Amino acid sequence: NMFTRGVEPAPTKPSNISARTQMGYGDVDAGFADADVIVERSYKTEQTHQGYIEPHACLASVNPDGTAELWVTTQGHFSFRNVCSSLLGLDIAKLKVTSSEIGGGFGGKTHVWGEPVALALSRKANRPVKLVMSREEVFRGSGPTSSTSIDIKMGAKKDGTITAAVAEMRYQGGAFPGTWAMLGCMTAFACYDIKNNRSIGWDVVVNRPKVAAYRAPSAPMAAF
């Protein structure tokens, strides 16, 4: 059972909401009271895939002496080394990871997918193993960005000064928690000089593919 983190008092019933994040400063109620005009809008963004030209691909080679090499289209070879060595019980000092030509990533190639499988097969076969996802496997097996539902409320003076702003953002995270909702909260009003603001982010778990990073995960929706 999952209980929402970041809520006070702590919930006593489980739900599909993993976490609540809040950021901001000032007095939004006073800011709205001082406004000449208040505008409220709701927006939705759809789940989209990074759509990189080259699919996920790797070449793994595990030697009898325990040393191993992994050539992989990755944006984060150190995290790949950490995850793969941990999953397979390899000595991290003996695993060398080389980032090959990425072929596009946009955040989607920071995550480990089939690489541990390639290493395990190489260790079993005592031969190098190459693994390349088909385009269908990329869409089925890797993660797109979150879809969102966002409510915005802003107050302003007649001279254009924004007196208060509130954003409530619900991020669809797929079947597992972890949507970087905090980055959305950090982004929502970062470009503006608003003395009274509050951003709330919800990490919502649903029966859909697990999401992955896509160009500053969770931030573009909030910036929009």
Over which residues does each language-model region extend?
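Structural alpha/beta core scaffold segments of enzyme domains
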Residues: N1-F224
